[in-house]
């Protein structure tokens, strides 16, 4: 999977950009604030329908403009697609695949599997469980065709149940929901557990390469006692849940935990080690997708040089090159990119929203 061409209009300081990319490495250099991260953000938005920088879309649309537009030409093996996304200032989103309206953001996300590596991405390891659930659910979204619909239904039922609890309704009013909720909770949790176990060998192999001095172990926790039937637990805990106003236990509390030499990684690893572990996890997940589904991820890496020494940068670049994936990397100077020791690709200079291709 690769983006061969990208058109960006009215997206932050990228007023009118039309670029052709290499299917391997694409390097973006320029001063801070020049627009390097904005280009990564535009690519991410095309594949997710949201930003990794701002939750308010109006801040992304160029000043005094009614909308922004993204268009990409996508290639995978012998197949080609055109994808487009337009975000209006009043909030509407229009998504197109091969010129056809009526597509959902999930359709774009399925077509464009992406892995994002940023300095803020350490929340995967030192943030709350929701970040690690999202990590698992990303993989399941691309591995199980029915996962997304089950996940949406599960969250809808949880929202309805929590609303009923906060309104102090009796158990008889929500019992019918709990039957379906329990069924979906077990299905989603089983999928998560299976995926976590399937991913374990790739994680251990990649961590051994990046952090050979540490023994990294992983464990999945489904959000309630493993031996307990979830429907029974909902009934048992109803009075407690009603008193609190929301459902305390369940798949919405699941976690995927990481330890280094038996201790939580967020307590014992340096920021550099945490970044290496984050990179290892993203690479392992991308490689697992390739092994299982024969699909390449697109890797977006912002501020490549931060927290990593020269040896680790070269090691990461080597693994990315071996993966055969398309990679977008930002850095301040071309010298930082030379340390990656990548012989081919494309180099772009970004200067206040203007992007020029240079000789690599």
List each model region and its residues:
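Nucleotide-state sensing region of NTPase/ATPase domains
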Residues: 48-131, 137-147, 200, 204-205, ...
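An accessory alpha-helical subdomain
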Residues: 121-210, 221
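Post-Walker A helix-loop "phosphate-sensing" segment adjacent to the P-loop in P-loop NTPases
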Residues: 45-57, 284-292
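Conserved NTPase motor "head" modules and their coupling/switch loops across ABC/AAA+ ATPases, GTPases
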Residues: 1-31, 172-298, 307-311, 315-326, ...
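Structural recognition of the conserved hydrophobic beta-strand(s) that form the central parallel beta-sheet
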Residues: 72, 326-332
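Conserved lysine of the Walker
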Residues: 36
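Walker B catalytic acidic pair
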Residues: 302-304
């Amino acid at each position: 999977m690769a983006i061969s061409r990208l058109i960006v209009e009215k997206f932050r300081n990228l007023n009118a950009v039309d670029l052709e990319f290499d299917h391997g490495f694409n390097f973006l250099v320029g001063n801070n604030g020049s627009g390097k991260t904005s280009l990564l953000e535009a690519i991410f938005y095309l594949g997710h329908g949201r930003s990794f920088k701002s939750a308010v879309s109006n801040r992304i649309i160029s000043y005094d403009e009614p909308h922004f537009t993204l268009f990409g030409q996508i290639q995978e093996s012998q197949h080609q697609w055109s994808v487009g996304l337009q975000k209006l200032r009043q909030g509407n989103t229009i998504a197109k695949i091969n010129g056809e309206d009526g597509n959902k953001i999930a359709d774009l996300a399925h077509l464009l599997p992406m892995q994002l590596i940023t300095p803020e991405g350490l929340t995967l390891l030192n943030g709350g469980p929701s970040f690690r659930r999202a990590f698992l659910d990303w993989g399941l979204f691309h591995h199980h065709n029915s996962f997304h619909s089950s996940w949406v239904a599960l969250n809808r039922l949880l929202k309805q149940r929590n609303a009923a609890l906060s309104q102090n309704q009796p158990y008889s009013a929500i019992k019918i929901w709990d039957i379906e909720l329990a069924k979906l909770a077990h299905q989603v949790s089983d999928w998560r557990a299976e995926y976590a176990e399937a991913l374990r060998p790739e994680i251990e192999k990649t961590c051994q390469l990046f952090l050979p001095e540490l023994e990294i172990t992983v464990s999945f926790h489904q959000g309630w006692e493993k031996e307990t039937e979830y429907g029974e637990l909902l009934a048992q805990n109803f009075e407690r849940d009603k008193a609190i106003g929301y459902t305390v236990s369940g798949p919405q509390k699941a976690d995927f935990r990481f330890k280094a030499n038996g201790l939580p990684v967020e307590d014992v690893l340096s920021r550099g080690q945490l970044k290496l572990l984050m990179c290892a996890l993203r690479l392992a997940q991308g490689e697992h997708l390739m092994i299982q589904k024969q699909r390449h991820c697109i890797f977006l890496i912002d501020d490549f040089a931060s927290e990593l020494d020269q040896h680790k940068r070269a090691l990461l670049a080597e693994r990315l090159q071996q993966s055969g994936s398309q990679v977008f990397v930002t850095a301040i100077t071309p010298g930082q990119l030379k340390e990656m020791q990548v012989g081919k690709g494309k180099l772009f200079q970004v200067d206040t929203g203007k992007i020029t291709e240079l000789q690599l």
